[in-house]
């Protein structure tokens, strides 16, 4: 099932090219807003799944193109993001030590929304194409063998980043938790629709140009291991988001006016816009292109990204 919020956060289910309003079927779930409605629905899923399926079977819905799609999981209690979690197409000899960071839930935006680049001296702004797992039940100290049974569903996720901010060592919080730096959606797909989450192609386009193109089978620490490890540190609750990392080789600068599209196989296509009032610019190059060009000029050089060309903070 593909769950989504639309218009004024009505709960819907995707049915082909239409969305069926199922708000009436979940009216009995205690909630104060769309965030805890989704979290509580996930927690009580066994009692509502058949009811929603029946409503979808009977309903014709309205064209999904006629509605405004909202973030499908607008109020997670936490967003845990796996760090350096891909083998980078075999260029790493071994996985990096397992690691993660928190991203603020207030960073979430959805389909058609705008990521706003702040007035800070970042070396570059990027967005990492990722697949996220959404937790389905309370999860604490679970084994790797059990971990996937705690997943409710999957969705597209962008890990927005303002890289290179001073001072050195003061990194993840101010780089990752900016408002609008967590686009998700367009919908949440339940696990029964995803045969193998470790074999999904992920693609990201910037203004229609394919920039990232990799598979979840390139993860250094798979989804089950990641969830098991995270749950050994803190309890995960229904609706919590686990972003599983990215292959960095296709990362590229996000700039004012860009249209970004992210599609993970089976999870739909998320699109959103970029706004930068300072109109800063960078060369339109991926990290892989930067590496290859630098090595041609200086053997052993390995720059992560292209320098800023114009605008405030350019050097």
Identify the residue ranges that each predicted region occupies.
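RNA pseudouridine synthases
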Residues: 135-138, 142-157
